């Protein structure tokens, strides 16, 4: 895993919006920062909150904790729980088609645009 991180242009850490997941996320951030120091060039780190349930206190507090700890590294939105995506993953089937109107797919599209925008900004700064 370390060799892959050393060769990477970006580290994206998808993190379930639950308290226990925050421990693993913090470890991945520390590992990314260690790799960045050893390779002597930036390794942009992006944190993507996933499986977010806005109805629960644990989900809301976990999202706030991510934002407090990691600031602009955290996507300002979150991927909501989407049962169709979860069920399809369990069956190893494609979850959605282009015509699927679910909130989960729309959030993944916004996340992709955010990541691509971050990469474009990084390229502009490097030039």
At which residue positions do the language-model features occur?
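H/E-rich (His + Asp/Glu) clusters that bind or coordinate divalent metals
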Residues: 73, 109-112
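Short, hydrophobic alpha-helical segments
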Residues: 115-123
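C-terminal accessory region of SF2 helicases/translocases
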Residues: 126-127
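Glycine-centered secondary-structure boundary/capping sites
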Residues: 39, 92, 116-117
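Conserved catalytic-core segment of NTP-binding enzymes
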Residues: 1-77, 83
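C-terminal boundary of histidine-terminating zinc-finger modules
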Residues: 87-110
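Generic structural signal for well-ordered alpha-helical scaffold segments
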Residues: 33-36, 112, 116
